[in-house]
Design a protein with these regions (language model features):
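A glycine- and small-aliphatic-rich helix-loop capping segment at beta-alpha/alpha-beta transitions
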Residues: 89-97, 120, 141-149, 227-235, ...
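Well-ordered alpha-helical segments embedded in enzymatic catalytic cores
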Residues: 49-56, 112, 189-193, 263-266, ...
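An N-terminal, well-structured beta->alpha segment
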Residues: 1-90, 180-209, 220
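Gly/Ser/Thr-enriched, mixed-charge loops and adjacent short helices
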Residues: 18-22, 26-27, 138-263
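Glycine-rich phosphate-binding loop of actin/hexokinase-like ATP-binding domains
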Residues: 126, 138-159, 289-318
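Proline/glycine-rich low-complexity loops and linkers
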Residues: 105, 165-186, 295-327
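Generic secondary-structure signature for well-ordered alpha-helical cores
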Residues: 12-16, 39, 43, 55, ...
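N-terminal small/polar loop signature for handling phosphorylated ligands or for N-terminal nucleophile
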Residues: 74-137, 235-291
Length: 327
């Protein structure tokens, strides 16, 4: 009914630009999956385009792993409008095709979705997210059994399968017996694994009072990042309260890209108020980080991705030299 109403509105509009844009082609399933504006039409993110992508992936999984036991997948999603609906529809379609589904109970960071695929021994997984794109967008990322995005030869083979699917082929009626809800059980294992990556826990102990301002920009980072920082030993973590609220409308930012100064404005404002040492922000699916710190004049400046990477690399090399692991 919702789709019919939207199409009817476009048909009745004398200006057919929107109608043409929504239907003039199929939303392309590429090597990274799907990404596009949400709405009715073959060139939009909706239950039918998401359904076709899931049906195509299910068909390919059943071809690849036929006679190899129960096939399973992980399904995750971010905070975006319709992400949960798309995730539940995808879970139904996978299960209707005989595939066991581990569906996260709520939004989770993309890295945890990748981890869960390996931890649970799944053959594939998907995450419903459009990363840091504006609120009108949503997306569909596909992963293989190693937790990484699908690579050759599977990527093009999946694309071929998706392109064969018609609306009539999509099995929307799920099998609830094959859908298992996951959440805190996987969170704990994931955070335990993340904490083993600490290069020198003693450094954290010495810097436990480091004043950190964090914002998830309304996204999935809110579920794990604050608790992870505290479990690691940082005792002075301050979250931007208005941006800890889950919302696909991203009401406090123009665009939820943590590398944009505008998106960090509220976090920097809080940092100035409490005299923090560093600002951290994550995008809606928490696989991209933006950072800011004070320069030698005490002014807050953004650290871009390249600079952040260099700082990490410098610290790793410095630590390995100090511990005799590198010359």
């Amino acid at each position: 009914a919702e789709t019919q109403a939207e199409v009817k509105r476009m048909l009745e509009n004398p200006d057919k630009t929107e109608l043409i844009e929504c239907f003039y082609k199929d939303l392309e399933f590429g090597t990274g999956g799907l990404r596009g504006i949400m709405g009715a039409g073959s060139n939009r993110m909706n239950i039918y385009t998401v359904g076709a992508a899931t049906q195509g992936l299910a068909n390919y999984l059943n071809k690849c792993f036929k006679d190899k036991g129960q096939i399973s997948v992980v399904v995750g999603h971010d905070c975006r409008n319709n992400s949960r609906k798309f995730a539940e529809i995808s879970a139904d379609i996978f299960s209707a095709n005989g595939i066991k589904v581990y569906l996260f109970e709520d939004l989770r960071p993309t890295p945890e979705v990748s981890f869960a695929i390996r931890h649970l021994g799944c053959q594939s997984g998907i995450n419903l997210t459009a990363s840091h794109n504006p609120k009108e967008y949503n997306g569909y990322k596909a992963y293989w059994d190693d937790g990484a995005q699908v690579l050759a030869p599977h990527d093009t083979a999946i694309i071929d399968e998706v392109n064969k699917v018609t609306v009539e082929d999509i099995k929307f009626k799920g099998n609830k017996d094959l859908i298992q809800i996951i959440g805190e059980d996987v969170d704990k294992v994931y955070l335990d694994k993340v904490h083993t990556l600490s290069i020198d826990p003693e450094v954290i102990k010495r810097q436990k009072d480091l004043s950190i301002v964090y914002t998830p920009l309304h996204g999935a980072g809110r579920t794990l990042i604050p608790v992870s920082l505290k479990e690691w030993g940082f005792e002075n973590v301050h979250c931007v309260p208005e941006q800890m609220v889950k919302s696909g409308d991203f009401p406090t930012v123009v665009s939820p890209n943590p590398e944009n100064a505008e998106a960090l404005s509220m976090a920097i404002e809080l940092a100035k108020k409490i005299d923090a040492d560093i600002v951290m922000a994550s995008d809606p699916d928490a696989d991209r980080v933006g950072m800011a710190c004070k320069d030698d004049k005490g002014e807050w400046v953004l650290i871009n991705g390249n600079q952040t990477c260099l700082l990490f690399l410098y610290y790793i090399i410095k630590n390995r030299i100090a511990t005799g692991k590198m010359q």
